[in-house]
Amino acid sequence: MASVKLFFIAILVVALSLNTSAAVLNPSSTAKPRFETKDRKLSAGALQSLAG
């Protein structure tokens, strides 16, 4: 029973270390944003419909 717990703890440690090493190799600050911001300008018709 103790060996099973040890085995699961070892798997958890390996998974955590792989996760942190992947985060170090691929920092989120340099990664592309999922949704790129676009310059959206309202047309005159849209402004009129917003104004009522």
Curated annotation (Swiss-Prot):
Tissue spec: Main cells of the accessory glands of males.
Molecular-function annotations in GO: hormone activity
One BP term from GO: sexual reproduction
Organism: Drosophila melanogaster (Fruit fly)
GO CC, one annotated term: extracellular space
Signal sequence bounds: 1-22
Major location category of this protein: secreted
Protein name in the entry: Accessory gland-specific peptide 95EF
Function summary: This protein may be a precursor of secreted proteins and peptide hormones.
Keyword annotations from UniProtKB, A to Z: Behavior, Hormone, Secreted, Signal
Record's note on what induces expression: By mating.
Cellular localisation: Secreted
